[in-house]
Structures are given as structure tokens and as C-alpha cells.
Amino acid sequence: MTPETEQLLRRWYMGQLIVLFGAAFIQLFTFDGGVFFPVGGMQLLIWGLLAWWPAAEEDQAQWWRLRHVNYYVQTVLQFTLLPILLANLVAWLSQLSWLDEQGLIAVGMAYLMVAFVPVAVVVTKPIESVIGRIAVLITAIFSGVVSAQQTFLILPNLQAPSVFEMVSDTGILGALGFVIAVEVLLRGWELTGPSWRFNRQAQTSLVVGLIVVGTAFSLWNAFSAGGSWATTFTHWDFQLRSATWKMFLSGLEPGIAEEWLYRFAVLTLLLQAFRHRRRQLDWAVWLSGGLFGMWHITNAFAGQPLSATVEQIIFAATLGWFLASTYLYSGSILLPMVIHAAIDILSMMASGSQTMVKPDAFEWQTIGATVIIFVGITIYFLTGSRRQVIQAHVNQRLLAQ
């Protein structure tokens, strides 16, 4: 990232702060006779000054620990609350009779796709710890950006059309915004973007094999109606119980955002962190998949049965290992994105649900078989000539400076 680009993003960041915090002060002062202004205004002032600090500071050793704590605090606060500040601005502007509220809401939802870019560069980029970088990526940044449009519409005085609410609930706009923000952030950390083209050194037959495995699993996972090993590959139900745009976009969102998070950002950071280790690939692949699995534990807090969540953690980890090896060998981030999206879209449309139910005994058996297959494929690609192809691709493309 050039100094000119970074300076431009800093100006964008400061201008965004002035507008959003200014509108918040006005609303506090005018709402209900300003009764909340003394306390709320003081809190907003303190937050605003701390938010301004990263943009105004120069390279210096003073207050080093406090400044770095502030980077984490501002990352959490701004990635979480920026949509609410923007919604407040839209609500205030909509009070002007000559401005259309629905048009303002549409502009606000679109702006949220890029609003986090200056925040990422000014506030999150200075974080140097690999653990810290991964921690903020998989928590505040992912949840804040992907759910930004949904958070934006949380204010009761914004009346959005039903189609706006449907799109915001799917998180698809947030997923696209996450792609943009994380791409810029990793470039700020001096890491290259993901590769899109297939690796010319990879054997075509093996890449085709990965595509076949991904396709076959997507179809079996969604449409197999068998309840035993004798029927699981012979009994099928191809009925789509909820073939709606909402289900399609809800399944597409993790295919984009989660792959961008784990197969691009987290995997690249781990590859960089272990670049001097002999087992660099093993550490990066197995850790990224394990993190991907454990990351799904939060679904238990959303009302999903604990046994279903445990099953999902195991499945997500093994799928993460398979998708990581698929990406590293094929060379294209599109392949794991398409496989992941196909799995989620087809399963959601076929079942009509976005959550998992309590697994029965046979489902635990199929999970065990899935673990054996995906772990076996991962080990296969991390050994022999396949490993050499992956290592060359990592050195020449993913970690090239």
C-alpha cells in the first residue's frame, strides 16, 4: 500500500468520523429535549477522541501499550457500532421532507459495503501480533461487517421495504463488504491477495478429482434420503422445500465470506507466521481447519442443540482441512468458494432450514466416514509431489512480496 493511498484512507476515516459523530451529537441534543445529552454526549466525546487518536498520531514510542490497546478497542467498537451511527445519520436526514427515506436506506446499505475500509487501515492495520490479527478477524471484523446491513436496520424509526430486510438478513451484502475490507487490510499487512487462476503446475486429473469429490458430497449431503448404509447411496429425495432467494443468498454468504476469512485471510496469516518452520504447510492447514471448526461453537448460543453443534464443529473442521488443501493445490480461491456455497445452498433449500437438528446414530456414523475421507484427502495432498506443488505455489504466489 503506497503512502499516498494510506493518507487518502486516513482522510476518509477522519471525514467519516466527523459526519457520523456529528450527527450522533445532534440527535442526542434534540431527542426528548436533550435529556440524554449530558451522559450520552460525554460517552460519545470520549469515544470520538479515542477513535481520532489512531488517525492523528505519528510514529512514536510514547504511550505504546495504551495505543495498542486502543487499536483493539476501536476495532471492536467501530466494526460493531458503525452501522448504528450510519443508521442514525440516515434517520436524521430522512426527517428532511425533500429526501426519500427508502432512497437514503438504499444508499446507506450500499455505503456499508465500503465504510469499513478506512477503519481497517487506520485502526486495525497497526495490530502486529498474528494471534491478535486472527482474533479480531474471526470475531469483531467478521461479525460486524457481515451483519452490518442487518444492524443498520435495527433502529425502529427506519422503515425499510421487505426486500431490503430480506437481503440484509442473508448477509450477502456484508459478505461482499467483508471481501473488500479484508483484501485492503491484508495488503496493508504486506500480504498478497488470494490467487484466482488455477495453478499450472497442478495435475489436471487431481483438480478434476477434487471438483468431483466436492460435487458428489454436496449432492449426497443435501439429497440422500437413506437412513442406513444400505440405503444412503440408493434412496434420494431431490425435492427443494425452500427454493427461495433468501435461502440461496443465505447459503451463498458463507461460501463467500467464510472462505475469504479462513481459506484466504487466516490461512495466509498462518502460512506467513510459520514460513520458517519445516512443517509450515501442516501447521497452517491443520490449525486453520481446527479454528474453523471451533468457530461454529457460537451456534449453540443461537438455540441450536448442543449435540448438533458438536457435530457441526467436527464436520466444519474436516471440511476446512479439505477446502484448504483444495485451495492450496488448485491455486484458485474460487474452487473452495463454489464447493462451500454449493454445500450450504443445496442443504438449506432441501431441508428448508438454516440450522442443524439433533443427529441420530446413523448421522454420527456418516460424520465419522466424512472425517476419514476428508482427512485422508488432506494428508494425500500434503505429501509427495502434491506437497511440492503446494509449497512452490505458496512461495511464488501467496507469500511473494
Name every feature range the model reports, one short phrase each.
Residues 1-7, 58-73, 125-130, 191-200, ...:
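Membrane-interfacial, low-structure loops and terminal tails that flank and connect transmembrane helices
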Residues 2-11, 20-38, 54-61, 331-401:
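C-terminal membrane module of polytopic membrane proteins
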Residues 7-26, 42-48, 71-88, 111-113, ...:
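Alpha-helical transmembrane segments
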Residues 10-12, 34-49, 100-115, 164-177, ...:
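Alpha-helical transmembrane segments of polytopic membrane proteins
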Residues 25-35, 90-108, 119-140, 151-260, ...:
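Juxtamembrane helix-loop-helix connectors linking adjacent transmembrane helices
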Residues 47-65, 115-125, 182-184, 263:
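Canonical alpha-helical transmembrane segments
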Residues 206-207, 282-287, 313-314, 334-338:
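Hydrophobic alpha-helical transmembrane segments
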Residues 257-287, 325-332:
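Membrane-interface helix/loop boundary segments of multi-pass membrane proteins
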